[in-house]
């Protein structure tokens, strides 16, 4: 419904929409006409801006809509038209949820008082408080009194309540008494369902009624048995008693199962020992300790798999076989990378160590240098050594130096060449000289004069350097 603020103190209705077809059944056309009349009367009323009423509360609090609960409709409504209109909508909702109860109560003999009088067709007709009080019996559904006979269930319809004046609070006491009676009937029905026998009631004890299927079950048939004496064979139990009985039986069944398992185990393990027939009521302390240890071991194993899975690439399968297979492949690949890096590290370290030794061996004023380094794996009869020749100059012919050294070694009988390596080193910026390094690994057999050999090599290099 759309409202307009008038002079910042009152609200008047500009437009409204009333959905009658989806909520009012075809059999209650009089009730629908009453609700529609209340709706038009509600639209024509002028409502002051007060925060404790609707729709002023929505405008003052800037709310798109306000949900009115049934217990708040008396307090939030501003006038009697609003109250009766809201409670007519509540009755329509209850009729939609409980169609069978309303069909049962709306018999022709007792439905005349629900039919509203005819209003004149002029636009000046309105609902007075006296007319509104005539339909106050529609505010809440009437609850039938339980029957005290053991016959078939005949649900009586209560007579219409006295008219209730919606203005004075002292006239609302019958309404609250009716509500209290309804709540008591609901409570008795729930208790009857919970404490009743497990066998379903006879279908012949209640009349068959046709209506729309709902998710709720009828309870008035149980209310009618309140005055009936309980059968001796039926034992009424509360929900707590039934729960305790269930868990007691569950505990007994578990103990019996443990006893059978232990009896089977003892019969197989100690059949010839003569000690059979002695059963325990549960697992022993050793078995419990073993079970606890096994559970902890599984938990640690699952945690280890979780940690290993977090280290693998994203997209890896989560099953344990896939995790182990991919982890093994990753470890093999990483081990290969580590081996390559270690080999490269050794090469770089050897190169740096050789360059440092060369820089230490060759002084700035020297043009060449010859040095011999013994290998620790040598023996007294067969020795292995490295002969290093460092030569510096502007123009150096590497092939001539290699030929001279090889010719010299060929002349010595007890010296054999194992390997040879030659390389050049770049000098600092601005220095045009070249440093040539030749490393020869030699094997010496028998007697050998190291100083004479080193001096002979120096003469060969000196002849080429000059």
Curated annotation (Swiss-Prot):
InterPro entries: bHLH92/bHLH041-like (IPR044658), bHLH95_bHLH (IPR045239), bHLH_dom (IPR011598), DUF7049 (IPR055477), DUF7050 (IPR055478), HLH_DNA-bd_sf (IPR036638)
Domain bHLH: 285-334
Organism expressing this protein natively: Arabidopsis thaliana (Mouse-ear cress)
Residue ranges, compositional bias (Low complexity): 120-129
SMART domains: HLH (SM00353)
Keywords: DNA-binding, Nucleus, Transcription, Transcription regulation
Main location: nucleus
GO molecular function, one term: DNA-binding transcription factor activity
Biased composition (Gly residues): 268-279
GO biological-process terms attached to the record: regulation of DNA-templated transcription
Region: Disordered, residue numbers: 108-129, 194-213, 260-289
Protein name, entry field: Putative transcription factor bHLH041
Family matches, as Gene3D superfamilies: Helix-loop-helix DNA-binding domain
Signal peptide, first to last residue: none
Pfam families registered for this protein in UniProt: DUF7049, DUF7050, HLH
Subcellular location: Nucleus
GO CC terms of this entry: nucleus
Keyword Iron-sulfur recorded: no
Subunit structure: Homodimer.
């Amino acid at each position: 419904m759309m409202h307009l603020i008038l002079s910042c103190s009152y609200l008047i209705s500009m437009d409204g929409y009333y959905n009658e077809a989806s909520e009012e059944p075809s059999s209650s056309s009089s009730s629908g006409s009453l609700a529609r009349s209340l709706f038009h009367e509600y639209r024509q009323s002028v409502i002051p801006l007060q925060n404790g009423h609707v729709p002023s509360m929505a405008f003052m609090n800037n709310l798109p809509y306000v949900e009115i609960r049934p217990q708040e409709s008396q307090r939030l409504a501003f006038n009697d038209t609003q109250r009766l209109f809201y409670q007519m909508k509540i009755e329509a909702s209850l009729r939609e949820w409980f169609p069978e109860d309303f069909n049962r109560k709306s018999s022709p003999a007792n439905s005349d008082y629900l039919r509203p009088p005819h209003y004149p067709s002029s636009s000046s007709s309105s609902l007075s408080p006296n007319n509104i009080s005539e339909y106050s019996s529609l505010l809440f559904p009437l609850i039938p009194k339980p029957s005290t006979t053991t016959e078939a269930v005949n649900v009586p319809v209560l007579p219409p309540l006295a008219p209730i004046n919606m203005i004075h609070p002292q006239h609302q006491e019958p309404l609250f008494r009716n509500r209290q009676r309804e709540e008591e009937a609901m409570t008795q029905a729930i208790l009857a369902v919970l404490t009743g026998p497990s066998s379903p009631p006879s279908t012949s004890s209640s009349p068959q009624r046709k209506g729309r299927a709902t998710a709720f079950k009828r309870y008035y048939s149980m209310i009618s048995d309140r005055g009936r004496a309980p059968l001796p064979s039926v034992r009424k139990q509360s929900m707590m008693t039934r729960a305790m009985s269930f868990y007691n039986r569950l505990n007994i069944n578990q103990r019996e199962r443990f006893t059978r398992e232990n009896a089977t185990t003892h019969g197989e393990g100690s059949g010839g020992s003569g000690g059979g027939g002695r059963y325990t009521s549960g697992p022993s302390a050793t078995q419990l300790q073993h079970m606890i240890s096994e559970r902890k071991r599984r938990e640690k194993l699952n945690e280890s798999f979780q940690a290993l899975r977090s280290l693998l690439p994203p997209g890896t399968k989560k099953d344990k076989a896939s995790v182990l297979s991919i982890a093994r492949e990753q470890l093999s690949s990483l081990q290969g990378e580590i081996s390559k890096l270690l080999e490269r590290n050794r090469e770089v370290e050897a190169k740096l160590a050789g360059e440092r030794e060369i820089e230490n061996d060759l002084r700035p004023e020297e043009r060449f240098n010859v040095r011999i380094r013994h290998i620790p794996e040598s023996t007294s009869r067969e020795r292995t050594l490295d002969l290093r020749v460092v030569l510096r100059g502007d123009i150096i012919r590497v092939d001539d130096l290699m030929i001279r050294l090889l010719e010299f070694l060929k002349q010595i009988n007890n010296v054999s060449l194992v390997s040879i390596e030659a390389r050049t080193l770049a000098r600092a910026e601005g220095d045009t000289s070249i440093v040539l390094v030749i490393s020869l690994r030699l094997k010496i057999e028998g007697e050998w004069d190291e100083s004479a050999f080193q001096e002979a090599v120096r003469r060969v290099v000196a002849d080429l350097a000059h």
